[in-house]
């Protein structure tokens, strides 16, 4: 049953994408004409797509403003393509830092030679090998009281 339902859904989806199964259209009566809402919407969008965007300046705040080259440069080469430069707002992140890096070695390493000559005490204690003979002593009583048993 599940396979049949899955196959039916897949066939319906494929027919829908291919356009074999048209969508149900209900006529809307307006002023004596039968108009289908989908067709009316397409006409409206087609006419709005042809209108220039500068009229309302809807995308103005979203797009960066291009920097125009001087008119003298365009007059020299009228047949050449004109390049429009835009401001790179991420340039400070891509460019390396100016000047040398800060020397922070003195934090971990002393600067003077006198300090290097002295022996620095080892921070790790020297571990001695202990050879066990026989079974290990039971030390559980140190962590657990006798009342727990």
From Swiss-Prot:
Signal peptide: 1-20
Region Disordered, residue ranges: 51-79, 97-122
Intracellular or extracellular location(s): Secreted; Endoplasmic reticulum
CC per GO annotation: endoplasmic reticulum; extracellular region
Record flagged with keyword Iron: no
Subcellular location, principal: secreted
Keywords: Endoplasmic reticulum, Lipid-binding, Secreted, Signal
Keyword Endoplasmic reticulum: yes
GO function terms (MF aspect): triglyceride binding
Complexes and interactors: Interacts with MTTP. Interacts with MAD1L1.
Name the UniProt record assigns to this protein: Proline-rich acidic protein 1
A Gene Ontology BP annotation from the UniProt entry: positive regulation of phospholipid transport
Deleted gene: phenotype: Mice show an increase in the length of the small intestine. Gain significantly less body weight and fat mass when on high-fat diets compared with littermate controls and are prevented from hepatosteatosis. Show increased cytokine expression and altered gut microbiota, and are significantly more susceptible to oxidative insult by ionizing radiation, showing accelerated mortality and enterocyte apoptosis.
Comp. bias regions, Basic and acidic residues: 66-79
Tissue expression from the record: Predominantly expressed in the intestinal epithelial cells than in the liver (at protein level). Abundantly expressed in the uterus during late pregnancy by uterus epithelial cells. After birth expression rapidly decreases and is no longer found in the uterus by the third day. Also highly expressed in the small intestine where it shows a proximal-distal graded expression.
Entry function: Lipid-binding protein which promotes lipid absorption by facilitating MTTP-mediated lipid transfer (mainly triglycerides and phospholipids) and MTTP-mediated apoB lipoprotein assembly and secretion. Protects the gastrointestinal epithelium from irradiation-induced apoptosis. May play an important role in maintaining normal growth homeostasis in epithelial cells. Involved in p53/TP53-dependent cell survival after DNA damage.
């Amino acid at each position: 049953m599940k396979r049949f339902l899955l196959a039916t859904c897949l066939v319906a989806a494929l027919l829908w994408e291919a356009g074999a199964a048209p969508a149900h259209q209900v006529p809307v009566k307006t002023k004596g004409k039968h108009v289908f809402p989908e067709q009316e919407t397409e006409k409206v969008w087609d006419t709005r797509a042809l209108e220039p965007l500068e009229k309302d300046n809807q995308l103005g705040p979203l797009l960066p403003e291009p920097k125009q080259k001087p008119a003298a440069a365009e007059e020299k080469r009228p047949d050449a393509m004109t390049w429009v430069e835009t401001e790179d707002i991420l340039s400070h992140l891509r460019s390396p830092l100016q000047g040398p890096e800060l020397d922070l070695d003195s934090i971990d390493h002393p600067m003077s030679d006198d300090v290097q000559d002295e022996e620095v005490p080892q921070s790790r204690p020297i571990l001695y090998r202990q050879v066990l003979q026989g079974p290990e002593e039971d030390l559980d009583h140190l962590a657990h009281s006798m009342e727990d048993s």
